[in-house]
Amino acid sequence: MNPTTATDAHERTSLLSGRPQSAANSTAPYERQVQPSRKSQCFTPVTVITIITLIYRLATTMVITTNIRVLHTVACQLWYHVNDPDVFPGGNIPEKYCALPGVDKYYAIMVSMTTVIDGLGGILGTGIASYMSSRFGRKPVLMFLLSCTMIDHLAILTVQNVYGWKQLVTFGLIMIVETIGNENTTVFLVSMYVVDVTEAERRTAALSSITGWLVLGGALAYSIGGSITTFLHSNSAVYIVSFSVTGIVLTFTAFVLPESFPAEKRDLLRLERLAETRGHSQSWTQKIKAVATVALEPMELLKPTFNPITGKANWRLVYCALHSFIVTLADAYALPAMLIFFTTQYSYTPAQMGYVMTTYSVSSVFVLAIALPLFIRWFKPLYNNTQTKSVPDEGDGLRATDSGEAGVHTQEVVVSETSDRMDVHITVISWTIESLAYIVLGTVGSFYAQLLGRPLPLLALDLDAFQEFEA
């Protein structure tokens, strides 16, 4: 079957294209779509969401290096409040008195908690954001997530000015807000928006462009945020700047960004759901279970599919998921552990942390944009090019990324080539480089040696992440 002719109309046409035209007057609107004016090209929905994504990434990333110092300060204050509250009753503790094993333990626990919360928020947030955006639209949910970011900054400003159990309660509020409105969920919603407003042939390029702007925003923000904190000698200044920038992004989103999932499609989806549940009364337990099922609905994609050519179940996605889980489990600990190590053992300033994280972003761009494509181009001829064809199961075409749009898409059969094992070899090489690089990074003692050694594990991590995405 020709994939081009089998593609659904909703996959081929932007959701913002408007109502269908009649046969008599369909030519002119079609020509306007194919040859848009220069003004419309400058202010397309993709352009608007790209601007929002870049500035959002800049605002949220510039506080990361200062977050490390704030967490260490809060951990020190909590440790003294619990173990020796009479020494510093006001909470103003000199930094030299925080160099204690107990403080380092509190700090490690707090960093681990933020990492775990971020991961859980990514798992639950994507499903919930998909469901809520299918009911209320992409734009309102995006505005809600931006509001959560602003509340998070206010809470971090507050936690620096309270002491004792109020500080602990405020830290708990920060954890809750970051679970709901974390960056992973926001980026996921942006990706859904791009899929809505772009045609099938242009989606890969649009998503790649969004990713590139995200990396650029992060690369600029790390150094900017760390420098603001270091040169102004204030942990609050960067949060005020980030709060203001996020507020501008929220206002821009409210008045400029068009909705990508219009009310007609939401109403149609609501009628489909009512038809499915008509005549079936649900208890509160069943309703709660249904909400949990929506949040975990992306996990259903891991179900093995049947390959009609081989006559066997296709477990490749399950293997990739297991690999991603194991590697991410290690990498998710390695980065916070490295930041804890640099903060507690070498007393890195936010500016130095900014240089380290900037090196991270630059190395990511180098690996994904230059090194990896050249590597594949040079070594691809060495591999056996005789590859078997794989036809996905019929159910694959019906699985939609958005839980609310499963009934809108139709089947698309795609014939793909199986792996020539080059991706497997790149993954193994990345494991080796990353393992050795972290060992070397822990043995060097100077800042510049650590700065030069930092890109090596990230290079391996980017290689591994790209192979997971390609698989």
Swiss-Prot record:
Residues with attached carbohydrate: 25, 384
Compartments (UniProt record): Membrane
Compositional bias per record (Polar residues), positions renumbered to this chain: 14-36
An annotated GO cellular component: membrane
Keyword line: Glycoprotein, Membrane, Transmembrane, Transmembrane helix, Transport
Pfam family, one: MFS_1
Membrane topology: Multi-pass membrane protein
Gene3D superfamilies on file: MFS general substrate transporter like domains
TM region(s), chain numbering: 44-64, 108-128, 140-160, 168-188, 212-232, 237-257, 322-342, 356-376, 424-444
Region (Disordered): 1-36
InterPro entries recorded: MFS (IPR011701), MFS_trans_sf (IPR036259)
A GO molecular function held by the record: transmembrane transporter activity
Function recorded in the entry: Major facilitator-type transporter; part of the gene cluster that mediates the biosynthesis of psilocybin, a psychotropic tryptamine-derived natural product.
Family, per entry: Belongs to the major facilitator superfamily. TCR/Tet family.
Name this polypeptide is given: Major facilitator-type transporter psiT1
